[in-house]
Amino acid sequence: MVEDQRRQLMEEEDEERRLILEEQRRRMMRADRDEEEEEEEEEEEEEREEDDGRRSEDEMREDEPPGRRETSHAHIDLNMMRANAHLKEMMDKNRRFVSTRLEEPITQSPPLTNGSNHDNDHDPYLSHRAAHGGSPDLPHSYMKAAHPLIKKEDGIAKMEMDIGLKDEMKMGAGLEDRDGDKPQTEWSFEEQFKQLYELSTDSKRKEFLDDLFSYMQKRGTPVNRIPIMAKQVLDLYELYNLVVAKGGLVEVINKKQWREITKGLNLPASITSAAFTLRTQYMKYLYPYECEKKGLSSPSELQSAIDGNRREGRRPSYHSPHMHPRGPSLAYHHGLDLHTPSGSPPPTMIPHPSRIPTLPPRLSPSTSPIEDDHPVPLGFPRQGTLSHAAMLAELAERGSIPPPSKRSLLAEEHHHRLLQLQQQHLVMPTAHLKVSSARAHPENGMPLFEMRGDNSLVMSIELNSVLYQGVLYPRGGTRSSLDRDTSTPV
């Protein structure tokens, strides 16, 4: 988006420059035509005067004696010579004036830095930019603008457009004066980017900036304007030193050290998109120089770092249910892992995860406890085709456990279905619970697992030597609250 705006701004400036040059060309051609018309009128008037003078002289000559007639001819010839000399002098002055006016845009100095606007009175475009608060510096594309020149044909000054990049307009080249005899004083990078050179008194600043601008010019991407950030000049020297000290641009991007770079440059903390702006400015002005001088990274590594930073920026939060695998369903016959998406207890009698110790998972049927001698293999599918009751029936057929009663199968099926519904909304594993299914606690005789006639389920869970008991109601039933008693530690 920023590059498109810059490109659009450059195109608008190019169009403005072209229109100004075209208007200047039309004005000069109009002035040239007016001068030609004036000269033609003067010549015609002089010819008429000469004709009138000849006719009057002929008339007078007829009346004059022969000796005086020769004297008159000599006087007329002398006057004609004086008139021709005066006319030639006037025409030479006009040609020199037009040539001077048209050659002035060519002999301008190279683009100046912000705040420097001397010699702008010669170029109407630079004067217009400086008068409206703009920078008189021109982009590199203006070096290929049309330059008006003078061509003499039959004593008349005519103007034509020479399209192309002139040698005298190249950056760093000496410019010839109007006479074409002596080259003007060559300008330096320090004169063009004076503000960058005066940011500090570091002795290595001038050496670095000269080397940087010279390298960028040799590689065909000259620096033609001073980078601005937060309404102040961006110190390329300090920016380069800070980034190189941290291992180069790729290292800064990967480790997200732009905040330290911003502080090192004394930029305001409230600036928006500081990391993106500094990265783009560094890539434009300094990264080729870093690769050439330091070789800390390659363009392919830089692109990989940028792509990785973009992917990380699009990564969802850690609490998103799509970033973590769902908790496994009943993977063991004796175990169950319960977990919640944000650390809050599930809708059963499970306390906060921070208070739940890690216990070995164990789940037993409601009629008779199943010993640890018959575990289900770990590779049991998360959503198998057999229900939990069917799995128990299969184990009973093998002789591992006695066949459960119909009522216990219904209770176990209901309990298993309830746990599966809970697992559909769980994300992070929190604790392993020990769910007992015996009819009564071995010590106090309290019922631990019982299916009641109103489709409710009485459960008791032993957690950290604390016995929790409550009544579970089916989802969508008339009662949604949970009655829970906490007994004393066993």
Swiss-Prot record:
Residues 389-479 form the REKLES domain. Keywords: Developmental protein, DNA-binding, Nucleus, Transcription, Transcription regulation. Its main location: nucleus. Residues 34-50 have a biased composition (Acidic residues). Pfam families: ARID. GO terms for molecular function: DNA binding. Residues 1-77, 106-135, 298-369 are annotated as: Disordered. GO terms for biological process: regulation of transcription by RNA polymerase II. Residues 1-33, 51-76 have a biased composition (Basic and acidic residues). Residues 106-117 have a biased composition (Polar residues). SUPFAM superfamilies: ARID-like. Residues 202-294 form the ARID domain. GO terms for cellular component: nucleus. InterPro entries: ARI3A/B/C (IPR045147), ARID_dom (IPR001606), ARID_dom_sf (IPR036431), REKLES_domain (IPR023334). Residues 316-325 have a biased composition (Basic residues). It is found in: Nucleus. The keyword Ribonucleoprotein does not apply. PROSITE patterns: ARID, REKLES. Transcription factor involved in skeletogenesis and oral ectoderm patterning. This is Protein dead ringer homolog. It comes from Strongylocentrotus purpuratus (Purple sea urchin). The gene is dri.
